[in-house]
């Protein structure tokens, strides 16, 4: 019998900077799972799942929560729940996860036209950006009126200024628009800014709150909103195959970090990112965005850096990178930080002698997690990913 082709065994997240999704369950989480409730969550009978939903909803100042297997699912069913009869359009940042990384879900599930907007300040959408791309429901039959604004906090690691969110919310209320937040990393925004989740909840009609990124849970997201909204969203979760039976184990594991000092964990990861950003700036390595939280985005195009070379340099030091997108989480060690500094510095120096042509077909992120030879070159071909 031919053996299955399996990936290498995953050992540790301490050297993995590809994404904050690579956090691994702690011993405390594994122990908690053994004591989890075993009710049927599809019928609303699982105690720990309900406890998780209510806990996150209350933290965000919302009436109800809905546990979903992923942020993609919670985003998509949230937007679908807000929308009624097409034609309509959704307005979001051109880099938004709901637009670029969710397999055309908005077009397929919500039948919506998406209006992607480039922020005029380069970092986040302002009210003026939104107004200039808003499609009014003014009787013009050629357009698809804007019904919903979707904002991401954080996006590219940038914390959305609270005062700008307040301005956008007021305008949405004046114009009868729903405001959704992809809060995959809203925990990071709350920790860094000091703005409580409840205050964000007062601004948005719905928030998708991820549990499996910086928070470290193995799976899941909680969609929060008012009771009527969540009741309807439950139908769409079922329709999309997202109902889970005994989800208590996953819920119990997620509650471990929520009930612990999650802010300190996140701020630790932010401090590593801040230190790397300062190092890059001191070396003259250009960055794409401010390193507000746990991400450092190296401007590979401006630096003429080859992302494959950067990945290989990381592997030389046993650090896993995803191109110029360096993502920190609470399980990354300071030793890894020092190693990634060396990898980036060497890739930058290499680019000075061998500038990379960035004008061909581009990919957003590149990654490889295989072994390397003595020179730091990957043994297997570098794999290219969008996310």
Swiss-Prot record:
The keyword Secreted does not apply. The modification Phosphoserine is found at residues 367, 369. Keywords: Isopeptide bond, Lyase, Phosphoprotein, Pyridoxal phosphate, Ubl conjugation. There is a cross-link at residue 228 (Glycyl lysine isopeptide (Lys-Gly) (interchain with G-Cter in ubiquitin)). Gene3D superfamilies: Aspartate Aminotransferase, domain 1 (3.90.1150.10), Type I PLP-dependent aspartate aminotransferase-like (Major domain) (3.40.640.10). GO terms for molecular function: L-allo-threonine aldolase activity; threonine aldolase activity. It comes from the Eukaryota. Catalyzes the cleavage of L-allo-threonine and L-threonine to glycine and acetaldehyde. This is Low specificity L-threonine aldolase. It comes from Saccharomyces cerevisiae (strain ATCC 204508 / S288c) (Baker's yeast). The gene is GLY1.
